[in-house]
């Protein structure tokens, strides 16, 4: 299971005992043949629960408060500038966020030595599973489940967008769940502020949930990219299959237009690039499918909301706030229980001239914020 964001996966995994290091201040484990060294308050045993693209995840208990946590090890975190920047960005963002539907960061384990550390250990709240696992399981999902998952996702996203942040990588495996069906958004490593323009060329992003404007390399994208991803997730909850499982960008756009219809000239106005407009016009033309026939198992309200999310032109796509007011979510929606972020997030800590050593110093400081030197 890919729990690479470090929160999901309460079940499974053998317990592993460790040995004390650094005068008993730390405990060293051997997990899948990898060293896993954490502060001693995370008392043995620990339990491996996942291996993701960015490292190993273990479940543990904080002996100081009895809290169950997930600890994600990012090994050799500073070998690659892009990955180092991604790790710092996620730590800073999660520390800025404080919302029931966003995974909470609990600790950055302070390395034993400032001058000699290469691994980063991020501690977050432990969740039971993720939406990808649930969709792939045999567990029946009712319309009530669908409503509740969607409502929580939009509620968390409202908070994220109010901080001037775009998530940019929403997908079922980044949405963690517990046994009560409480949902939390995770993995902010690709997030950006709404004012930044970046074609995401640095990263391999999951293509299936990407909005048309990103597939067409539109640099002036908005919060609407996340709404498109939510629409893809909504459709997948009901059908139990990805809506647009494209093998490449060309097939991805083909699958999209086969469902929502080929865009007319007025729907291509947002594209600044003549090449992108020409490309879309020379593709095979498809009529719009009837969503009620395509999604027969979906309630009428869910179909209506899905149609408003899967709109080619981002300026015509429903916003998160409008979606929360949609009749489909009326039984859950309460404006007084949908908070916004008190302060916008800033990526000012990221300087183009930053080396891996600069990033290492900033992550060290983050670990000190959680684990300050004792007063003498």
From Swiss-Prot:
Dually phosphorylated on Thr-201 and Tyr-203, which activates the enzyme. GO terms for molecular function: ATP binding; MAP kinase activity; protein serine kinase activity; protein serine/threonine kinase activity. The keyword ATP-binding applies. The active site is at residue 169. The TXY motif contains the threonine and tyrosine residues whose phosphorylation activates the MAP kinases. A motif (TXY) lies at residues 201-203. InterPro entries: Kinase-like_dom_sf, MAP_kinase, MAP_kinase_CS, Prot_kinase_dom, Protein_kinase_ATP_BS, Ser/Thr_kinase_AS. The modification Phosphothreonine is found at residue 201. Its EC number is 2.7.11.24. Keywords: ATP-binding, Kinase, Nucleotide-binding, Phosphoprotein, Serine/threonine-protein kinase, Transferase. The modification Phosphotyrosine is found at residue 203. It catalyses: L-seryl-[protein] + ATP = O-phospho-L-seryl-[protein] + ADP + H(+); L-threonyl-[protein] + ATP = O-phospho-L-threonyl-[protein] + ADP + H(+). It is an enzyme of class 2 (transferase). This is Mitogen-activated protein kinase 6. One of its GO terms (biological process) is intracellular signal transduction. Residues 43-329 form the Protein kinase domain. The keyword Nucleus does not apply. Activated by threonine and tyrosine phosphorylation. One of its GO terms (cellular component) is cytoplasm. SMART domains: S_TKc. ATP binds at residues 49-57, 72.
